[in-house]
UniProtKB/Swiss-Prot annotation:
Protein name per Swiss-Prot or TrEMBL: Translation initiation factor IF-2
CDD domains: IF2_eIF5B, IF2_mtIF2_II, mtIF2_IVc
HAMAP family: IF_2_B
Transmembrane spans: none
Purpose: One of the essential components for the initiation of protein synthesis. Protects formylmethionyl-tRNA from spontaneous hydrolysis and promotes its binding to the 30S ribosomal subunits. Also involved in the hydrolysis of GTP during the formation of the 70S ribosomal complex.
Amino acid sequence: MASNNVAQFAAELKMPAGVLLEQLQAAGVQKASEDDALSEADKARLLDHLRKSHGATDGDKRKITLTRKHTSEIKQSDATGKARTIQVEVRKKRTFVKRDDVSDVAEQGQAQVAEADDDAELKRREEEARREAALLEKQAQELRERQERLEREEAERRAREEAAEAERRRAEEEAAAKRAAAEAAAAQQAAQQAAAAQQAAAPADSAQDEARAAAERAAQREAAKKAEDAAREAAEKARAEQEEIRKRREAAEAEARAIREMMNTPRKAVVKAVEPPKPAEPAKPAEAKGTLHKPAKPEGAQARPAAKKPAAAPAATPAPAGAGDRNKKPGGGKGGWQDDAAKRRGIKTRGDSSGGVDRGWRGGPKGRGRHQDNASSFQAPTEPIVREVHVPETISVADLAHKMAIKASEVIKVMMKMGQMVTINQVLDQETAMIVVEELGHRALAAKLDDPEALLVEGETGSDAEQLPRPPVVTVMGHVDHGKTSLLDYIRRAKVAAGEAGGITQHIGAYHVETPRGVVTFLDTPGHEAFTAMRARGAKATDIVILVVAADDGVMPQTKEAISHAKAGGVPIVVAINKIDKPEANPDRVKQELVAEGVVPEEYGGDSPFVPVSAKTGAGIDDLLENVLLQAEVLELKAPVEAPAKGIVIEAKLDKGKGPVATMLVQSGTLSRGDIVLAGTAYGRVRAMLDENGKPTKEAGPSIPVEIQGLSEVPAAGEEVIVLPDERKAREIALFRQGKFRDVKLAKQQAAKLESMLEQMGEGEVQNLPLIIKADVQGSQEALVQSLLKLSTDEVRVQIVHSAVGGISESDVNLATASKAVIIGFNTRADAQARKLAEANGIDIRYYNIIYDAVDEVKAAMSGMLAPEKREVVTGMVEVRQVFKVPKVGTVAGCMVTDGIVKRSSSVRVLRNNVVIFTGELESLKRFKDDVKEVKQGFECGMSVKNFNDILEGDQFEVFEVTEVARTL
């Protein structure tokens, strides 16, 4: 908005009005109050004065170049799965040219705004980087806490095990000591008993006996001492073995813990589990020299003979530290994970240039012995790593396996166990992929990708335009032939109903009418049952519903459906009881039926106005409009006008000359010619806008229906239309929606293939009627497809091969030839090439303009595909009077026709005592010796039955014929 006085200019400059008045007076512009008008010349004088007062000179044009550099890091995984850090540097260069013309003030303002936008973008990126860094820090903190918790639990478990082991060893030592003491005591007691016995037997032995006894006592003491020493040695040996086992277990646990830490630590920093003691620095070796056949011996090869000797305690040193020392390069700075790959990149000569790590042409005697594995011979058991896998809406099998850090074959095996055969490149839907992730023991999270549609939601919340009153959108709904369009025509003073094929509405008509009390927008919906989706769209976009009910017909099925649509949308209903000019009209009955459906008139204490009208004479039309506008006032309908437009697609079609054309209802904002619009998967610039009368218009405000041209494709009816400032952003969102829809659709189809195959196997033989449907508008095509699919039965099924909007082309005929389909054109025609191709290939093309006719003819075609029904008709009764046995012929019955007529081609049932004993065919029918075609009632004949000779006198033959009767749906 231009600033026309001092106060507005001060507000624009964000400074007090008094200060601005002082500056104006100093510049020679005489302004006394804040309401004085300002001209462009006054502003120019003020600008010159300010420049001079601040020391600005009128020199040549100058320019300033600003260069901004922003450096960041990103982590990218390569094909092997290793993460690499990549430095990203973003450089921005902007040049500002200083001009002296007053007319360039606006351009400078725009440059400042652009710079502010760049600053805001930079701040936003910095904020995102900070958030990402905080998230990474939080994840690292959680990882550290989890690792500390695991180590704490491991230490507690180890302490408990050590305490139990010490207690067990102490108990064993005590038991061994007790056993040794008991053995010594027993030996001593035995010796004493023997000595006592000897003394008792011979109290006066000689000195020789005493010497022998002393020797025996010494031997016993020696034996007791040896037993005690043996027990002590056994206890010490057991204690040493337990200590050795404990040391080995601790070493294995330390090794496993170091491996876990190395695997869980981020790749940019290699964590060393145990820091080995630094050896003394050796003297700098001389420069290694070698020839082509005998390369220089690396440092690792010098210590090879010593490495072959067994170590004193191989498990005492943790594996990662030892492996790191073994694989370390002379200038090493990288961990052992990448050393092998670096060594393999060297030129392979005939000598072992890798120091024995990788076998070259000379690997040792007969390929043995020289190679020594980097990994430790002890493989400690590690607990499985549970990963959080973010699963997008669609993901291939290979990508899913990569996210879980497993081979794709493992995923394929799991899918096979679940009963689904997949390939490595097959796309899975989100639900199936999450089941697979959970099956493999990981946590599955539904991922939210970088959805460009999120920007649309952010843009919606930021709209703060002024809300102004808008016209109401009124939808006319009701049963077919109840007079909706005729009522609307009387209001519009036009004749539309006569122009619709068959006199019924088959499109949504959108019109706006100017009444003395304001503008009203009307939506006329079809009443035929096939147009349920159209009526639902009409109720979605409306503010008030006019429910038209014929006074002579009452509440019908589509009337009930319209009531349910209005109630589902929470839309107030105004009931118009039409055709009151007819003699059989009964408005009271209509009211009672509507009360039963939950629509209570105001006179009964409800909230729905009931207005009796006549679309033929015009009676009650003014009262109807009065009630509609009264409801609109109660609703206080408002919408922003000075804002980007938003609306809904009411109808869409493909015009041969104009391309995709969409009828949309603007719900808020103002739509102008040249705006960039996005409608579902379609986008484009509005090249032309027409009102409902076909006249060009430049803009359309809230609640105004318009027809727009310039979209990239035909949008689906009911899609939301939104105006975007940038065509690039519109294209990005449209392509994102297309890819998302296509991927999800393919994944769902793939998941349903096996189930559909099993269904078809169980159903057996089912007849299919393939159809290709081309219609003039999206709504008609949708309604026709739904109506035809409802005709499917268990025996005959309608198969819609393809349905689209537009004329019938050669590609449609080619598709019909390949699928053996019938082409149905609804208000469309085939071009010359398509007609010629259809005649050459024998393709049937049917044209319709009334939906009744299309449904009826398809129903008749399906009836013709049904298997005919077989019916039996009894034509006569025959009584057996005499039986003859004829050689080489069999049994022949002499019969009398008692009722009806017997034909040679008829079937027969043999009745004995009124019980059927055989059903078959006549083999011969003779009268005297002549073969005859038929025998009438009251005549005798001879008959023989095929494959049946057990005929007795008194039997009866029931003669019948089988006829086929065509079935109907």
